[in-house]
Curated annotation (Swiss-Prot):
Triggers of expression: By cadmium and lead. Induced by arsenite.
Catalytic residues identified in the record: E87
Gene that specifies this protein: GGCT2;1
GO cellular component: cytoplasm
Species whose genome carries this gene: Arabidopsis thaliana
GO molecular function, one term: glutathione specific gamma-glutamylcyclotransferase activity
Protein name: Gamma-glutamylcyclotransferase 2-1
Essential cofactor(s): Mn(2+)
Disruption phenotype: No visible phenotype under normal growth conditions, but mutant plants show increased tolerance to arsenite and cadmium.
Length: 216
């Protein structure tokens, strides 16, 4: 038996587990959105970060990295135990088909695990839902947690997508809006309080392609 896992957020640049093969490619009918709260890595229960999850969207594609773990049940178990601890804010695991640029009609791997979240604020305390770009940017610009600040996560994702040569306008637009927030005068920043989410209650400059500068 072989384990395949698809990463579309920090797993792209920081898998953190022992794997045997990495492929760059995409899954179909999903898009990346910053609609999930993170309260223990890049944010806190009082001021949650915004991190990636997937939203079903017919005709969309989401680029990322697929990791293969071979070597028997024990190795696969160790990888999954690590991932389930790390991805604890995702309440679902979905099986998807994984494609590469070499063949867009036939998946190169089937039965690939991807961590997803239920898009419902009632049943899923970590689901923030969509928000205006400026509001999301303000939340990302101000949130921080034990593993670092939220904006670093976003900027690293932006760079990771650049590195795999599949930049995403949604990520770039959000990252640039965060940069705008960070460039505000200090007296204006002081008026922009961090976004407080329902999670705390429940749980106590776009540069030309291939030449982008990733300033934080």
């Amino acid at each position: 038996m072989v384990l395949w896992v698809f990463g579309y957020g920090s797993l792209i640049w920081n898998p953190g587990f022992d794997f045997d093969e990495k492929l760059i490619g995409y899954i179909k009918d999903y898009k990346r959105v910053f609609d999930l709260a993170c309260i223990d890595h890049r944010g806190t229960p009082e001021h949650p970060a915004r991190t990636c999850t997937l939203e079903q969207s017919t005709g969309a594609i989401c680029w990322g990295a697929a990791y293969c773990v071979r070597g028997g049940p024990e190795k696969e178990k160790l990888a999954m135990e690590y991932l389930e601890r790390r991805e604890c804010e995702y309440d679902s695991k979905t099986l998807v088909e994984f494609y590469t640029e070499n063949d867009t009609s036939t998946p190169i791997v089937t039965g690939v695990i991807v961590f997803t979240s239920t898009p419902d604020k009632v049943s899923n305390k970590y689901y923030l839902g969509p928000a205006p770009l400026e509001e999301m940017a303000r939340q990302i610009a101000t949130a921080s947690g034990p593993c670092g600040n939220n904006r670093e996560y976003l900027f690293k994702l932006e760079k990771a997508m650049f590195d795999i040569e599949h930049e995403e306008e949604y990520v770039i637009e959000l990252a640039n809006e965060v940069r705008k927030q960070l460039d505000l005068p200090e007296e204006v920043k002081a008026l922009l309080k961090p976004i407080v989410s329902h999670v705390s209650v429940k749980s106590q400059a776009h540069v030309s392609t291939r030449q982008r500068v990733f300033a934080s």
